[in-house]
Amino acid sequence: MNLIAQLEAEQIAALGKDIPDFKAGDTVRVGYKVTEGTRTRVQMYEGVVISRKGGGIGASFTVRKISFGEGVERVFPLYSTNIDSITVVRRGRVRRAKLYYLRDRRGKSARIAEVSNYKPKADAKA
């Protein structure tokens, strides 16, 4: 392990975040801290993960949802201090790592089949 990877691993461990195992196609609910004036509250954002990018401390993921008939995408840094929680709502069965084609789909063609027999990876934290 090189020095940069070691430093990133130490920073991730110092954050102490419990990140669930999720990938593109999964539906997640992200609790994001929003500051309004002096008050801070947690806003839930639920949608389909259409991509995960990067590795280490700079990793991010993109979540897409349909809000009032319009598609809305939001990019979240995975280890951001503003992320309160990440919950996997359902597991999707897809054959791509990036689901950008969902931007052009509407209705039934934009649906993702659910995985019924999901088993977490052996090396992932349970």
Swiss-Prot record:
Record keywords, A-Z: Ribonucleoprotein, Ribosomal protein
GO biological process, one term: translation
Molecular-function GO terms, alphabetical: structural constituent of ribosome
Gene Ontology cellular component list: cytosolic large ribosomal subunit
Keyword set includes Transmembrane helix: no
InterPro entries on file: Ribosomal_bL19, Ribosomal_bL19_CS, Ribosomal_bL19_sf, Translation_prot_SH3-like_sf
NCBIfam families according to UniProt: rplS_bact
Functional note: This protein is located at the 30S-50S ribosomal subunit interface and may play a role in the structure and function of the aminoacyl-tRNA binding site.
PANTHER family: LARGE RIBOSOMAL SUBUNIT PROTEIN BL19M (PTHR15680:SF9), RIBOSOMAL PROTEIN L19 (PTHR15680)
Family affiliation: Belongs to the bacterial ribosomal protein bL19 family.
HAMAP family with a match to the protein in the record: Ribosomal_bL19
Name of this protein: Large ribosomal subunit protein bL19
Lineage, top ranks: Bacteria, Pseudomonadati, Pseudomonadota, Alphaproteobacteria, Rhodobacterales
